[in-house]
């Protein structure tokens, strides 16, 4: 059974401005593992990576129904890729989490569907 659905879209140029020499932004948004991946990226690929993670975390918080804040922080949520490159959202939840991230020239978008773990 579907418990929640969340979607978020972010302008890449907004993230690009936040990344401009501001390691603090990445420390606030990305987990240590995500920052390790980000440090290997440059230019537009870095912007897309961070924007995708930002959108995924926002979409998850909307699917849960709390938004980012006291109950769920950016650092409570980690996005990894499986062996085929599919993004996987990792968090301490009892739900099955389905995540999709996409990018265009100007935007990154993510959608999260939460499903109850008992089928």
From Swiss-Prot:
One of its GO terms (molecular function) is holo-[acyl-carrier-protein] synthase activity. The keyword Lipid biosynthesis applies. It is found in: Cytoplasm. One of its GO terms (biological process) is fatty acid biosynthetic process. Pfam families: ACPS. Keywords: Cytoplasm, Fatty acid biosynthesis, Fatty acid metabolism, Lipid biosynthesis, Lipid metabolism, Magnesium, Metal-binding, Transferase. Its cofactor is Mg(2+). GO terms for cellular component: cytosol. InterPro entries: 4-PPantetheinyl_Trfase_dom, 4-PPantetheinyl_Trfase_dom_sf, ACPS, P-Pant_transferase_sf, Ppantetheine-prot_Trfase_dom. The keyword Lipid biosynthesis applies. Mg(2+) binds at residues 8, 58. It catalyses: apo-[ACP] + CoA = holo-[ACP] + adenosine 3',5'-bisphosphate + H(+). It is an enzyme of class 2 (transferase). Its EC number is 2.7.8.7. PANTHER family: L-AMINOADIPATE-SEMIALDEHYDE DEHYDROGENASE-PHOSPHOPANTETHEINYL TRANSFERASE (PTHR12215:SF10), PHOSPHOPANTETHEINE TRANSFERASE (PTHR12215). This is Holo-[acyl-carrier-protein] synthase. It comes from Bacillus cereus (strain G9842). The gene is acpS.
């Amino acid at each position: 059974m579907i418990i929640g659905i969340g979607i978020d879209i972010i302008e890449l140029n907004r993230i690009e401005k936040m990344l401009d020499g501001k390691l603090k932004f990445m420390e606030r948004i990305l987990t240590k593992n995500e920052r390790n991946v980000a440090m290997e990226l440059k230019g537009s690929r870095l912007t897309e990576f961070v924007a995708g993670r930002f959108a995924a975390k926002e979409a998850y918080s909307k699917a849960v129904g709390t938004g980012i804040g006291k109950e769920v922080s950016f650092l409570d949520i980690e996005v990894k890729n499986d062996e085929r490159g599919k993004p996987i959202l990792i968090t301490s939840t009892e739900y099955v989490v389905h995540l999709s991230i996409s990018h265009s020239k100007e935007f990154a978008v993510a959608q999260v569907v939460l499903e109850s773990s008992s089928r």
